[in-house]
């Protein structure tokens, strides 16, 4: 492996982004060997990562939104090599990047390649990996049904608008949750199982989550009496509903839902009647800012 070889896996819609081009050029002028590959269709990111690992690249950069980040991170983790991950946030929500303190400006984001990569955890459910968060209930439906065109026009506000227009479809989910020293059963409106802290365009469902603690943060919003009003508050920023959440921090969690539960894994839908969530500690090395809110402690000095 050549420690200086870096490959940017860039979402196809960002191929003409002039800020990205300038940031890449600046890295090259500074002496970094930085190549770029562009995705075109589903599966491209995974294939590009696999080819990059075989070619000896030391670092992969995920250039896109949360979905691109999940694809690259999963492929990198399954490759079981020593290559690290850097993040170039170019999506609508950029939930993981925002919570981690990663700059949204391309040049500043790529500058994090100079930071020492830190080992972080990944979440896993029924054989699928996720970097940020699994969401369930009405919030996951909003994320899944927000159109790309609307996100392009409104940015993160698109999730709010989609939620407001789908109030007529609001109904509670039913589930049983089991984990070490934690049991809960009932109807719920929203669910977050977080390695990271926020999802759905800035909704902070797991405010104390860390990506290097070997735990998943569980946040359940039980169905309130004023369901529509509470949901409106949640979609509008969440102020005033904090005290309603049931929370836990666990190494694993089993969820049973007799009618099935729709879950969103960083943009990828999953449905099941029985889901088991667990943590893969230190599964991936990621270039994060010094003092990132998602890290427990500073890196050890060598």
Curated annotation (Swiss-Prot):
GO terms for biological process: phospholipid biosynthetic process. Gene3D superfamilies: 2.60.200.40, Probable inorganic polyphosphate/atp-NAD kinase, domain 1. The keyword Transmembrane helix does not apply. Residues 1-129 form the DAGKc domain. It is an enzyme of class 2 (transferase). The keyword Kinase applies. Binds 1 Mg(2+) ion per subunit. Ca(2+) may be able to substitute. Its EC number is 2.7.1.-. ATP binds at residues 39, 65-71, 92. It is found in: Cytoplasm. Its cofactor is Mg(2+); Ca(2+). The active site is at 268 (proton acceptor). InterPro entries: ATP-NAD_kinase_N (IPR017438), Diacylglycerol/lipid_kinase (IPR005218), Diacylglycerol_kinase_cat_dom (IPR001206), Lip_kinase_YegS (IPR022433), Lipid_Phosphate_FormReg (IPR050187), NAD/diacylglycerol_kinase_sf (IPR016064), YegS/DAGK_C (IPR045540). Mg(2+) binds at residues 210, 213, 215. GO terms for cellular component: cytoplasm. Probably phosphorylates lipids; the in vivo substrate is unknown. Belongs to the diacylglycerol/lipid kinase family. YegS lipid kinase subfamily. This is Probable lipid kinase YegS-like. It comes from Pseudomonas aeruginosa (strain ATCC 15692 / DSM 22644 / CIP 104116 / JCM 14847 / LMG 12228 / 1C / PRS 101 / PAO1).
């Amino acid at each position: 492996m050549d420690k200086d070889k870096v490959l940017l896996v860039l979402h196809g819609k960002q191929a003409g982004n002039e800020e990205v081009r300038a940031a890449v050029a600046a890295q090259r002028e500074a002496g970094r060997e930085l190549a770029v590959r562009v995705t075109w269709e589903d599966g491209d990111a995974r294939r590009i990562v696999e080819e990059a690992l075989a070619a000896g690249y030391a670092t992969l950069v995920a250039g896109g939104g949360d979905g691109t980040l999940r694809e690259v991170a999963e492929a990198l983790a399954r490759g079981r090599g020593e290559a690290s991950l850097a993040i170039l946030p170019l999506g609508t929500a950029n939930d993981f990047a925002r919570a981690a303190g990663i700059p949204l400006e391309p040049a500043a984001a790529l500058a994090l390649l100079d930071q020492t990569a830190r080992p972080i955890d990944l979440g896993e459910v029924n054989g699928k990996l996720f970097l940020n968060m699994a969401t369930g209930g009405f919030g996951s439906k909003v994320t899944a049904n927000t159109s790309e065109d609307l996100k392009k026009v409104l940015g993160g506000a698109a999730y709010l608008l989609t939620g407001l227009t789908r109030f007529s479809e609001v109904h509670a989910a039913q589930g049983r949750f089991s984990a070490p020293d934690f049991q809960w059963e009932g109807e719920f409106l929203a669910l977050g199982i977080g390695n990271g802290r926020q999802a759905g365009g800035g909704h902070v469902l797991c405010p104390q989550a860390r990506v290097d603690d070997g735990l998943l943060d569980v946040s359940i919003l039980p169905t309130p009496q004023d369901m529509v009003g509470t949901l409106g508050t949640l979609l509008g920023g969440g102020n005033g509903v904090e005290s309603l959440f049931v929370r836990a921090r666990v190494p694993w969690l089993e969820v049973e839902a007799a009618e099935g539960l729709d879950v969103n894994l960083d943009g990828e839908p999953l449905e099941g009647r029985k889901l088991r969530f667990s943590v893969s500690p230190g599964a991936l090395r990621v270039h994060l800012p010094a003092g990132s809110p998602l890290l427990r402690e500073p890196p050890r000095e060598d």
